[in-house]
């Protein structure tokens, strides 16, 4: 059996002066091209895992491996070449005077030749639908557009893994939808592993697999459908469920028995149509 592309094995991490571990005996894997969502309330350990995966922090115990490289002081730059991060606030990520300058910044730091750089910048901006804004000032973009440019900056570096660390939390619904659609298309085209750190439960529905964190440990793991079938268990640890799940619960309480938990409005409408046709 092929080894997972991203692996954490029995990882522990405690912040300085903290009494409890922020991450306690956590083992996680992700395959090439898989989308894994880590969800949990504040203090659950999910953002610490994001920092561990990119080598911003080193585990006290356990192993972290990206591709062929085990995270260590020796391999830190090899790890960071493979892992790109998109952070919460897009304004904190901009350094260039124009959109294309900003996307080129990371390539310049990596010593990429100019001709190659121009091609990569153009390709990355095309991929996120922002090529027509190449000469615009980043400050004049909407929140969703800024995050798409931030994603382009990561894509230009051609990473194997992209970590979204609460990347949509400061966006309005339209901006959030823009970014999620961009990530979905990017993953399909580039076969990139996506690890999204989020508390937005609707965002979780995009993932192939969900890992629920609680108090630094893995609480549960499964497909979005499997996780949200345990709605009461999610609420017990301070999390809610997506709107589509709440709607199904209300329908069931009102006497509409759906066949199974569904994750889209279209699938729910199909079930309601069948129920109506049978009556």
Curated annotation (Swiss-Prot):
Residue span, ABC transporter domain: 6-240
Pfam family for this entry, one: ABC_tran
Domain of life: Bacteria
Membrane topology annotation: Peripheral membrane protein
Keywords annotated in UniProt: ATP-binding, Cell membrane, Membrane, Nucleotide-binding, Translocase, Transport
Entry's localization field: Cell membrane
The keyword Membrane is assigned to this record: yes
Its EC number(s): 7.-.-.-
Residues involved in ATP binding: 40-47
Gene3D superfamilies: P-loop containing nucleotide triphosphate hydrolases (3.40.50.300)
Subunit structure: Forms a stable energy-coupling factor (ECF) transporter complex composed of 2 membrane-embedded substrate-binding proteins (S component), 2 ATP-binding proteins (A component) and 2 transmembrane proteins (T component).
Family: Belongs to the ABC transporter superfamily. Energy-coupling factor EcfA family.
PANTHER family from the UniProt entry: ENERGY-COUPLING FACTOR TRANSPORTER ATP-BINDING PROTEIN ECFA1, HEAVY METAL TRANSPORTER
Name the UniProt record assigns to this protein: Energy-coupling factor transporter ATP-binding protein EcfA1
